[in-house]
Amino acid sequence: QEYRESFIAAAGDAFVEQLNQRELHRRAREQEAVWLGDHHRHSRLHALHLEFLSELAQSGAKMTLLLEAVGTQDQPSVDAYLTGQLDMRALRADLRARWRGSWLDDPALDPSYFRSLLTFAREHGAPVRALEPTPREPLAKRDAILADTIAAARAEYPDRLLVVVLGQSHLLGEGDVVRRSGV
């Protein structure tokens, strides 16, 4: 609870600026990273994320997706999916074999969204990097690992827009992954 409250305090409630879609996409393409703060169960937000990503892809943006929904131990399976060596059903089975609560299947979340992100990446040739440290670390240690992983992806993909899909409470406040990543 304190963790979430620190995010709320850091985010504040000030409205900064309103942008039309065209300007939002233009500005996004000029950045090193786009941070998509996630509410893991919010299907309307997820639909907006996917629409935004599709429009970025249509505008020619080359992206790399960094996903909290994927555990680092699952990176080889995700890579196999992205290259066509596994289909979605096999990928889901691989992830469930390691972790019954895989975000690709957990009904308490919005699993179709997380599957759609991977499908999007495959269709657009976008690399994916797992963010969730596995085995799962305590929150304070996990945020440092998340930030380091994002910084490493920036170095690995300097010519791509990083799209970071991460629970919003990690972004600011106690977790402060945005600042800690240096991206």
Please give the residue ranges for each predicted region:
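Compositional signal for N-terminal targeting/processing segments
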Residues: 1-183
